[in-house]
């Protein structure tokens, strides 16, 4: 894996004027839009034509006491996502604004060109292939963040993904540097923290860098209720990438955060990297031994990076990986024995 060159503070800030300079063309009906929205929902989308309507409807169906606006950032899709967004905009011209351009601008720039055009004091995030499941999401989260000025953002549970931390009423920076515990689709953020933004790498792990930046400015309130759904599909930028690409993107994100915080949280970020390698090492049912051999090579190649930062955790990682074939074989044997036992019971009950 090649080294990463992102260094803070050399990378600098993206200012509000630079956000406005990102290529953008807006489709909206200014005369129909509400004047003072309470929440701006930012929906980044690319090649989500088959999912976009469900995402948009989950926003429009919110039971919320204040007006809302929905900004759809369409990032030059290869499919008919833009046409689908325009069709949906005609159904709710007082709410939906579409921001697009004649070229792809990337994840970070798509996010920032929506941020700088949002008008509400609170920003909710929802990507175009996910959706909200609770019609009270905005109301409950707005009530929570308005009653806690120390919160930079609030989050909730998300269906179809593992909860990597125990439920706590509040998460702080070390919590969310160690684990990716709250999903983008559950976030509600104070816009005041986004007038400028670090020029982080344009990486699929952008939300982890966003969380790190926000949690340096406040804490994260948490509602232990499922309010959104994370859709896993082969068109997703994360799941469509091979394991080497995913590990590279994760490492780039960790290095950027480590630099941004001037190495003050290297221990927490090393713990996160070990955790990522543990998840990556899980043996698939197809290509099992090829995956295991590649895992051994990958983990050994990271010795000079991981051992000095987390020696015990790294040795435990190697130990667990080394015995994976034995554990996998025992699991297969137990499955066969269980199937054989069930077959014998079925035969016994079928005989007269």
Model-derived features: positions:
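A conserved acidic beta->alpha catalytic loop
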Residues: 74-83, 103, 127
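Acidic helix N-cap motif at the loop->helix transition within catalytic regions
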Residues: 53, 79-88
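Conserved donor NDP-sugar-binding/catalytic core segment of glycosyltransferases
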Residues: 135-165
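Conserved nucleotide-sugar donor-binding catalytic segment
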Residues: 41, 116, 156, 165-246, ...
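Short aromatic/hydrophobic "clamp" motif used to bind/position activated sugar donors
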Residues: 123
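Glycine-rich, basic loop-to-helix element that forms the pyrophosphate-binding segment
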Residues: 101-118, 140
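Short, acidic, metal-binding catalytic loop of nucleotide-sugar glycosyltransferases
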Residues: 57-67
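C-terminal subregions of glycosyltransferases and related glycan-biosynthesis enzymes
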Residues: 3-36, 203-205, 209-212, 216, ...
């Amino acid at each position: 894996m090649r080294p990463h060159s992102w260094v803070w503070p050399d990378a600098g800030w993206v200012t509000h004027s630079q956000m406005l300079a990102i290529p953008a063309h807006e489709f909206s009906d200014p005369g129909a839009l509400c004047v003072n929205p309470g929440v701006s929902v930012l929906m980044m989308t690319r090649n989500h034509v088959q999912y976009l309507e469900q995402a948009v409807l989950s926003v429009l169906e919110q039971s919320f006491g204040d007006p809302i606006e929905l900004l759809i950032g369409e990032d030059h899709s290869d499919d008919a996502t833009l046409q689908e967004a325009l069709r949906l905009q005609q159904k709710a011209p007082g709410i939906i604004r579409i921001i697009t351009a004649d070229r792809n601008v990337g994840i970070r720039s798509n996010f920032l060109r929506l941020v700088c055009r949002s008008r509400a004091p609170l920003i909710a995030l929802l990507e175009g292939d996910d959706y909200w499941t609770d019609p009270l999401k905005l109301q409950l989260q707005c009530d929570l963040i308005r009653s806690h000025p120390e919160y930079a953002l609030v989050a909730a549970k998300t269906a179809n993904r593992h909860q990597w931390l125990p439920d706590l009423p509040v998460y702080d920076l070390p919590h969310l540097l160690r684990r990716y515990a709250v999903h983008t689709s559950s976030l509600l953020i104070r816009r005041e923290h986004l007038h400028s933004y670090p020029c982080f790498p344009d990486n699929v792990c952008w939300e982890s860098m966003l969380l790190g930046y926000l949690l340096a400015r406040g804490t994260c309130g948490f509602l232990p209720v499922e309010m959104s759904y994370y859709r896993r599909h082969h068109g997703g930028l994360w799941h469509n990438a091979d394991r080497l690409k995913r590990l590279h993107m994760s490492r780039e994100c960790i290095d950027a955060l480590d630099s941004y915080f001037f190495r003050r949280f290297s221990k927490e970020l090393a713990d996160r990297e070990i955790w990522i390698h543990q998840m990556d090492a899980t043996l698939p049912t197809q290509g099992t031994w090829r995956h295991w051999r590649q895992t051994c090579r990958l983990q050994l190649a990271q010795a000079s990076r991981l051992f000095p930062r987390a020696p015990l955790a790294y040795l435990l990682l190697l130990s667990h990986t080394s015995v994976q074939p034995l554990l996998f074989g025992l699991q297969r044997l137990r499955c066969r024995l269980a199937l054989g036992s069930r077959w014998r019971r079925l035969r016994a009950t079928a005989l007269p």
